[in-house]
């Protein structure tokens, strides 16, 4: 080891008596300075325009996206190392000094380890350049997430060391430094793209994925340290250092060709085995370095997986080859992406097993029938399979897939079926940018197989809003639209309809919804609803202006009334009957997501809403959930013509000003259980058209989901909201930005340049 350390010291002397080492340090410092100051400048501008509060500021500046400091520089680091490593051994070969090393009492491994340790020190100096920006971040960002950034630096350091080992081996192959550098770039490219090769072959796919360098350092930069990634870099370093030792040793000794060949094979096989075995789910250790544990599933999800015990969860993915919108996301080439998506869950439950079924069947897509041109489905499959170089025999026919499972109710879309202890449920994909189910939907699907499902019944018989229609005023989007992520059926609920004309309302449902009936409730219906209320059933009642007389008789038994008239709101942009209501502190108790919406001063849109009045005569504790803006809103009596002249307040016509509640929560104890009722003066806030509103940023989704979650006593949706970050403020000014630019663009690079120049001049004089 002493000899290796001495070689390392001599190699460092050689490195720093060359302008390349100094130049690379200066270039890296300037490059980092430009990225850092540009990001800080944008943050300073945002601070002046929108206020001083941000979210996850450390991540945004250092690791959050491709424009952040560490990822942006990571893409260019491969250019640095070959310029240093190209001369490590090539210089010895070309100058003849390798013969002196051979004749000295030094072992080959000491030569290789010494050279590599010199590179480890130089890489540490490169990391030290990053340290200057960490110091700046600590000064300018209160609650700076230091551990997150250190995790990123650790990943970059491992990557630099792996690059150095590769460059050292390439330098052992030739006496020409330029050839060594080019060869190093070739190996870098191979390791970057090997993970995309032969992805349709099962074992080869796993092997190439475990050998691929792509994404390894990025995971560490994101704050997730895994033994899989650390072992990968260790295996790469072991591989190329081992190959370097064997190469030099083979030129030093005379042995049959199969001896060094066997050594090469052993080192390669050992390295591949290390990379493959350490990437298997049961052998991976994790450490989440982020302050909010953003790389780890929430505690609620962890607890849910723990409750499943030792029984396995079977996940079967059904992919329709003819559904071109989704199949490319679930093809065999994407299998490793699927494994990575489920890795956070497998981390806490290793016996989640995955199965993949590929089939073809018709889908409700006009482009499919346009593509057929009279062909059969089988002929179309053969044509597409030939074009994509796939075996058509891997796809089950419609008859074969229907013997296993009938996916026509799912429109033969890509879907996953979860099985656990004899129960099963579907886990769907969605028509949004995220596409795949998030932690919330996965948690809901798993919990659906473990408990009795909360059921929401929608009253019918009085022309109420429909839960199954897609018309503007109806509720399919919120309740039963399978391709919509936030639909109740995808959040863990069951939804159904019920007619109180012919049957009693079950008392074991989560809630009954009475959504804007257009006809008066009959005495029998009122009696059955009252019986349900008296038994402690939860209830959602939604009314509309102009129909107060329909619901007020029922509401009177609750101590609530819908006031006559319509609330209007002055606005330069919207119709006067579109009221943008504020959330209240009472909403914070419904869900964490709604609490965050309240803290963010979010609004809920209610087009056509009336005010609610209440008293305590029925024994309920009443809290407003939504209130209209007292400055711009008033209650207009009489008919409202929204598309006529500008609506104005008229006390003479009976118009009222004041604080108007548009949604109320009512609670009381019945038979030892808290009864929960919500009354709203508008039924459109849950409608298909309102949930699709694009001209105002509203919290209708969050508000509606929170209400039904409240009815289920927190069973669904699963709460996966994460805590807010503490590093949300920037202690920075325009003058400070100028100082930082001066330091990182001028002072620091200038000091390095002067120091390196003086050292090189003194060395030349000697």
Regions found by a protein language model. Give the residues of each.
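Acidic, S/T/G-rich, low-cysteine, solvent-exposed domains in lumenal/extracellular/periplasmic regions
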Residues: 476-714
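Long, hydrophobic alpha-helical segments
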Residues: 65-91, 126
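Extracellular ligand-binding/catalytic regions of CAZymes and related secreted enzymes
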Residues: 254-282, 288-307, 314, 439-455, ...
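Hydrophobic alpha-helical transmembrane segments of multi-pass membrane transport/permease proteins
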Residues: 19-45, 72-81, 187-190
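Hydrophobic alpha-helical transmembrane segments of polytopic membrane proteins
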Residues: 150-176, 239-241
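Terminal transmembrane helical anchor/hairpin motif
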Residues: 39-64, 173, 180-253, 625, ...
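Juxtamembrane extramembrane loops of integral membrane proteins
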Residues: 280-414, 420, 426-435, 439-443, ...
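Selective transmembrane-helix segments that form parts of the transport pathway or gating/packing helices
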Residues: 19, 77, 81, 108-137, ...
């Amino acid at each position: 080891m002493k000899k290796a350390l001495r070689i390392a010291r001599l190699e460092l002397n050689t490195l720093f008596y060359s302008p390349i080492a100094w130049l690379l340090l200066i270039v890296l410092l300037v490059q980092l300075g430009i990225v850092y100051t540009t990001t800080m400048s944008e943050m300073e501008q945002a601070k002046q325009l929108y206020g001083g509060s941000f979210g996850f500021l450390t991540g945004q500046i250092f690791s959050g996206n491709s424009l952040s400091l560490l990822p942006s520089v990571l893409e260019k680091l491969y250019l640095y190392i070959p310029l240093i490593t190209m001369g490590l051994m090539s210089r010895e070969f070309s100058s003849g000094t390798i013969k002196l090393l051979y004749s000295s009492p030094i072992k080959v491994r000491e030569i290789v380890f010494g050279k590599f340790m010199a590179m480890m020190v130089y890489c540490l100096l490169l990391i030290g350049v990053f340290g200057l920006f960490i110091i700046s971040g600590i000064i300018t960002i209160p609650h700076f997430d230091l551990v997150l950034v250190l995790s990123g630096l650790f990943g970059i350091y491992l990557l630099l060391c792996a690059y150095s080992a590769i460059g050292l081996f390439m330098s052992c192959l030739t006496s020409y430094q330029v050839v060594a550098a080019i060869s190093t770039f070739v190996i870098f490219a191979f390791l970057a793209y090997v993970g995309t090769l032969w992805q349709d072959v099962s074992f080869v796919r796993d092997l190439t994925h475990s050998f691929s360098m792509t994404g390894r350092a990025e995971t560490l930069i994101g704050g997730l340290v895994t033994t899989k990634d650390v072992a990968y870099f260790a295996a790469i370093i072991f591989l190329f250092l081992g190959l370097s030792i064997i190469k030099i040793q083979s030129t030093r000794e005379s042995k049959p060709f199969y001896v060094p060949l066997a050594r090469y094979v052993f080192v390669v096989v050992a390295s591949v085995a290390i990379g493959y075995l350490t990437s298997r789910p049961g052998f991976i250790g994790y450490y989440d370095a982020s302050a909010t544990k953003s790389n780890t599933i929430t505690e609620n999800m962890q607890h849910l997986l723990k409750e499943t015990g030792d029984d396995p969860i079977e996940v079967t993915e059904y992919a329709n080859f003819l559904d071109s919108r989704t199949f490319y996301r679930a093809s065999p080439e994407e299998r490793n992406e699927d494994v990575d998506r489920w890795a956070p869950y497998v981390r806490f439950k290793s016996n989640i097993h995955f199965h993949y079924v590929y089939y073809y069947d018709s889908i409700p897509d006009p482009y499919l029938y346009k593509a057929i041109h009279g062909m059969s489905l089988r002929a179309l499959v053969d044509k597409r399979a030939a074009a994509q170089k796939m075996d058509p025999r891997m796809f089950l026919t419609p008859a074969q897939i229907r013997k296993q499972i009938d996916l026509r109710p799912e429109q033969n879309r890509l879907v996953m079926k979860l099985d656990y202890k004899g129960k099963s449920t579907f886990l769907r994909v969605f028509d949004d940018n995220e596409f795949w189910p998030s932690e919330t939907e996965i948690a809901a699907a798993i919990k659906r197989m473990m408990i009795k499902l909360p059921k929401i019944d929608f009253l019918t018989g009085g022309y109420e809003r429909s839960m199954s229609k897609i018309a503007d005023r109806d509720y399919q989007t919120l309740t039963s639209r399978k391709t919509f992520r936030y639909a109740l059926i995808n959040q863990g609920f069951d939804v159904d309809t019920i007619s109180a004309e012919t049957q009693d309302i079950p008392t074991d449902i989560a809630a009954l919804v009475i959504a804007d009936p257009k006809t008066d409730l009959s005495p029998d219906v009122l009696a059955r609803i009252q019986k349900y209320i008296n038994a402690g059933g939860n209830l959602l009642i939604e009314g509309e202006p102009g129909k107060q007389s329909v619901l007020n008789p029922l509401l009177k038994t609750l101590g609530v009334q819908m006031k006559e008239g319509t609330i209007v709101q002055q606005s330069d942009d919207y119709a006067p009957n579109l009221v943008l209501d504020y959330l209240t502190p009472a909403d914070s108790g419904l869900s964490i997501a709604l609490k965050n919406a309240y803290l963010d001063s979010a609004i809920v849109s209610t087009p056509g809403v009336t005010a609610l009045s209440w008293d305590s005569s029925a024994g309920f504790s009443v809290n407003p959930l939504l209130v209209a803006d007292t400055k711009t809103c008033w209650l207009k009596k009489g008919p409202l013509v929204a598309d006529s002249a500008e609506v104005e307040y008229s006390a003479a016509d009976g118009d009222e000003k004041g604080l108007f509640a548009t949604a109320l929560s009512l609670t009381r104890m019945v038979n030892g259980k808290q009864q929960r009722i919500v009354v709203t003066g508008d039924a459109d806030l849950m409608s298909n058209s309102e949930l699709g509103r694009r001209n105002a940023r509203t919290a209708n989704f969050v508000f509606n989901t929170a209400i039904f979650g409240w009815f289920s006593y927190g069973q669904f949706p699963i709460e996966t909201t994460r805590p807010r970050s503490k590093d949300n403020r920037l202690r920075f000014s325009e003058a400070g930005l100028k100082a930082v630019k001066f330091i990182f663009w001028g002072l620091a690079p200038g000091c390095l340049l002067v120091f390196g120049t003086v050292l090189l001049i003194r060395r030349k004089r000697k």
